[in-house]
Regions:
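Exposed, low-structure sequence patches enriched in small/polar residues
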Residues: 1-319
Length: 319
């Protein structure tokens, strides 16, 4: 499978919609802090994917990308003598590869690939290992960098008590790079529930160059509510989730300690010694299709311009 992608669009740093389009009408309904820090992205990408019957998939890519600061986002580089220089844009050239192993998986390979919601075998464990290599001096690339990611996910069945979908991820940026090339935890500022995203974290609130994250969603399948007279006939199903990330910013990528780096934007800080955590409780199968969750932020509660809690919704068919 060989593909070519040419893209010119505007994005919010720290907000990637992994399972839907960012132009989705529901995703466009924002409930978090107003998003004013943007980037114009111009990207050209070749990608090759090969799949084997044993569940192994190999994907490789090469791309050239230009990021231009927009809105209130500024690229301001601090020199060794304290001089501040504003840059209009940055360019990166990258080659990358990913191995994905999901033994026993059966999936519908649509626009979202094997991560589609139409995956027919959610019980299969999924393991991923990827590496991105930035090359300076090729097609205008300005930075050498190495970025490694590894993840594992599995559905755990608890018999009549429902099941838990779990995911463990870790990543590291090995080189000195400006903050747009560091790890920005994925946030969700929309009214919708988005997998693998933090719903109570502001976009660009934290930055890190190494992290470990854990996500778990427990589907109780009506184990509690089906035992309550008068409510059982509604066939509501309980959902509980937890999202957390722990990481840090090494000295070489901290502009407060190392020169020739971009200053962090206002409202952005390194992820500290305390992990960021949030949890939710909710109901699904409302009118057979609707899910409503209440999310609560558990740490970093004293930060300015944050929301400690909020309601998110999703359209989810349950069988």
């Amino acid at each position: 499978n060989l593909s070519f992608i040419q893209e010119y669009d505007v994005y919010t740093p720290g907000q990637d919609f992994l399972f839907t389009s960012k132009d989705n009408i529901f995703v466009a309904w924002k409930v978090g802090e107003p998003v004013t820090k943007m980037q114009y992205i111009r990207k050209s990408m070749f990608q090759y994917e090969k799949e084997w019957l044993n569940g192994l998939t190999w994907r490789s890519w090469v791309y050239n990308q230009n990021n231009q600061a927009a809105g209130t986002l500024k690229y301001i580089e601090k020199e060794a003598d304290g001089t501040l220089i504003q840059k209009k844009d940055i360019t990166t050239s990258e080659i990358g590869t990913q191995l994905r192993f999901a033994p026993g998986e059966r999936s519908y390979d649509g626009r979202s690939g094997k991560e589609s919601v139409f995956n027919l075998s959610k019980d299969a464990p999924i393991f991923k290992l990827s590496h991105q290599l930035g090359i300076k001096g090729v097609l205008g690339g300005e930075y050498n960098y190495n970025h490694t990611e590894v993840s594992a996910e599995k559905r755990i069945w608890l018999s009549s008590f429902g099941h838990i979908d779990t995911q463990l991820k870790a990543g590291k940026v090995w080189n000195k790079v400006p903050f747009p090339l560091l790890i920005l935890p994925n946030t969700n500022q929309s009214i919708t529930i988005q997998p693998e995203a933090f719903h109570m974290m502001n976009a660009l609130e934290f930055v890190t160059d190494q992290y470990v994250s854990f996500n778990a969603t427990y589907y109780l399948k009506g184990w509690i509510l089906n035992r309550i007279p008068g409510i059982k006939w509604l066939r509501l199903r309980e959902v509980i989730s937890f999202n957390g990330i722990y990481g840090g910013l090494t000295d070489k990528n901290n502009p407060a300690l190392t020169p020739n780096l971009f200053l962090l934007p206002d409202g952005t800080r390194p992820l500290g010694k305390t992990p960021y955590m949030e949890a939710s409780v909710g109901l699904e199968n409302i009118f057979k299709i609707l899910r409503i969750d209440y999310y609560r932020r558990l740490t970093y509660l004293d930060e300015p311009n944050i929301k400690k809690g909020g309601v998110r919704i999703a359209l989810r068919f349950s069988f």
